[in-house]
């Protein structure tokens, strides 16, 4: 009985954020942005975060991502940079920016590996977090 309760609670710990994410990706993305990106890129995304002055390379102005790409938000490039697996160092510069996909995996895998194997994989949760963050970044683009 105790094991079933633990599994149920662990499942709930992942289902509730997933439901919140499904109902408001940009809101969840904003939360992810403030938690993971704002210290370097600033609360407004302009690259003026509290630790920006201490970095060797200034953080990018994320509000002009679409403008710098011919007016189209580069969703795949944003995904690749955040996830960190398929992207070469070139488009991003150095890897001063943390590989958030790897960090999201680290945060997710520990509890998720105890969930029902028939449920969503840890990778599903990671991809939802990255997608929400990208939705938020797309929403703060200047015209």
Describe these PLM feature segments:
Residues 1-12:
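Bacterial N-terminal signal peptides that target proteins for export
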Residues 16-33, 60, 64-71:
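Electrostatic cytochrome c docking/interface patches
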Residues 25, 33-36, 74-77, 93, ...:
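Stable alpha-helical elements in mature extracytoplasmic
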Residues 27-38, 105, 120-128, 142-143:
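Sequence context surrounding c-type heme c attachment/ligation sites in exported
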Residues 29, 33-43, 97, 133, ...:
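The canonical Cys-X-X-Cys-His
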Residues 46-47:
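Short, non-ligating residues that shape and space the ligands of small metal-coordination modules
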Residues 50-54:
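Short cysteine/histidine-rich zinc-coordinating motifs and their immediately flanking basic loops
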Residues 55-121, 133-137:
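Extracytoplasmic electron-transfer domains, predominantly the class I c-type cytochrome c fold
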């Amino acid at each position: 009985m105790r094991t079933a309760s633990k599994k149920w609670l662990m499942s709930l710990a992942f289902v509730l954020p997933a439901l919140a994410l499904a109902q408001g990706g940009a809101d969840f993305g904003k939360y992810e942005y403030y938690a993971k990106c704002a210290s370097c890129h600033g609360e407004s995304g302009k690259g003026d975060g509290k630790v920006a002055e201490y970095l060797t390379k200034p953080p990018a102005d994320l509000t002009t991502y679409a403008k710098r790409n011919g007016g189209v938000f580069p969703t795949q490039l944003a995904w690749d940079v955040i996830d960190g697996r398929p992207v070469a160092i070139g488009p991003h510069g150095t890897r001063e920016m943390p590989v958030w996909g790897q960090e999201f995996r680290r945060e997710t895998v520990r509890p998720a590996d105890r969930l029902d194997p028939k449920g969503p994989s840890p990778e599903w949760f990671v991809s939802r977090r990255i997608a929400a963050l990208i939705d938020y970044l797309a929403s703060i683009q200047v015209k």
